[in-house]
Each structure stands twice: as structure tokens, then as C-alpha cells.
Amino acid sequence: MNKESKGMLIGFVGILIFSLTLPVSKIAMLTFDPYFIAFGRACLAGLVALGYLAYKKAPLPSKKDLAKYIVIALGIVFGFPILTTLAMKEGSSSHGAVILGMMPLASTVIGVLRFKERPSLGFWFVSLFGATLVVVYALLKSAGSVTYIDGLLVFGGICACVGYVEGGELSRRVNPRIVISWSLAISLPINIVMTYLTFNADYWMADAIALTSFLYLSLFSMFLGFFFWYEGLAIGGIARVSQVQLIQPFCTLLAASILLGDHLTTLNVVFAFLVISTVILSKKMLVQRN
């Protein structure tokens, strides 16, 4: 197995973990406030990450890398969780799943601008086609207009892509598990304060389903998923492996159907299938890495 295929396979494991984030967030919001979910899950993940760093006796980040960790944290610890959780307060996880299908293109663009990866024209065409499918889907679902929920999802997706690209590149020379751990750890002071401010005493009475959902968002969506995702990006390249994210909408649609009882409409399935097809095509396109 070559590096690109290995990177895509490892990255796919991370995507499977991430694909449950939106439907599980919907379940958690039946009990918890959206802001508590966003900050609380990062707080718990940060505490676990701090313990992991202590166990591994990881050295402190260098001054050069500290700026990268801050950018990563702004993207995946704050931006994406806050914006997408707010979107899920009123939007459906099925709708959000397909809108976030634009993330591979965003990751590719950021990778090209930041790290001079050079995808072929064919790769760009396939990526743009996949992103166009997502836009068309959004317009069809909202009677020809883009809603503020779409805006939250798009900006949240861009935040995540910035964190993905910076983290994936840093993981080429720093252990991917250390990268996500430090990103969470340096965010702890803010997340501890915000978790305290958004906590409600009624949360002590949360049922097992709510607690399990919160734990999944904290330990898997915010922490363990990045073990695989960052390693996949580092091995296979940002532009190539980021295309695996196009499979995430279909995985999320299935999860929403099973966990929430969301109906798998013909429109959802058709567009998810078309988007996944672009992943298969992109695998055949040339991407040069510097």
C-alpha cells in the first residue's frame, strides 16, 4: 500500500468518528445548552489531553510551533464546535452533513495557499464539482435561498479546515497525538471558565443518553478522532486525504437515520452518492507535494 492510500485509509477512520458529531450534538442538546456543549466538551477533552501529555512526558511546544497550536485551537477547539453546535440548535443534522461536504475543497485551497501543494487541473475540477453539488443541495433544500444556518455551517467548516490543514502539516514532524493534545491543553483556561459560566445545576440530573452523547463529543469528536485524521493528513498529503471528507455526509446521513430517525430522502441519498463519487475520481488525479 502506497503512502497516499495508507493516509486515506487512516484518515477515513477519523472521518467515521467525526461523522457522528452532528447527530450526537442534536441528542446532547435535548439536555444541555449549546454553549455548554461547545465549551464543556473541549474542557473535558483538554483535561484528558493534559493527562496524556503528562503520561508521555511530552516537551513544551517551541515558540515557533506555539503560534500553530493557537491557530489549530481557534479552528477546531473554538470555531467549529461553537458554530456547528449553534447551527444544530435549529437545523437538522442531515442538512448539516451535506453542507459540510464543502470542507474538502476548503482544505485543498488552504493547503495550496499555506504549503504549496500543487493539485492537477483535473483534481481542481473534481473538487469544484463536489463543492458545487453541495451548494446546489443547499439551495434545493431552502427554496433557492441560503439561510443563516447554512452560514454557520459554512464558517464552522472553514474554521475546521484551517485547524485540519495546520494540524496535518505540523503532524509531519510532531506526533499527531501530541499535536491535538497541545491544541486542547493550551485552550483549557478559556474552556474551564466558559464551562463554569454555562453550567446549569440541572445537568447533574442528566440521563445516561445525554451523558453518553456528551462523552462521545468530548473524547471522540474532540480528541481521539484527530489521532487518525492528523496522521492520515501527514502521511497522504492534505489535498489528497482531505477528499475523504466528502464521504462524511453519507456517513452522517446514516447515523442521523439510525440515532434520530431522520428520513433518508431521495434528495439526500442522491446528492450524497454524487459527492462520494467525486472522492473516487479525485483519487485518480495527480497531486504534487513540496
Regions of interest found by a model, annotated:
Residues 1-36, 142-169, 290:
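Glycine-/small-residue-enriched transmembrane alpha-helix faces in small-molecule transporters
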Residues 16-19, 23, 50, 74-78, ...:
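Hydrophobic/small/kink-forming positions within alpha-helical transmembrane segments
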Residues 17, 21-22, 50-96, 100, ...:
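Specific transmembrane alpha-helical segments of multi-pass solute transporters/efflux pumps
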Residues 20, 24-27, 31, 45-61, ...:
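Membrane-interface helix-cap regions at the ends of transmembrane helices
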Residues 38-40, 81, 95-102, 166-188, ...:
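Helix-helix packing/entry segments at the starts of transmembrane helices
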Residues 48-58, 84, 103-125, 250-270:
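C-terminal transmembrane-helix exit sites in multi-pass transporters
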Residues 49, 70-72, 102, 119-139, ...:
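Hydrophobic transmembrane alpha-helices of multi-pass small-molecule transport proteins
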Residues 49, 107-109, 113, 144-200, ...:
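Transmembrane alpha-helical segments that form core, pore/gating elements
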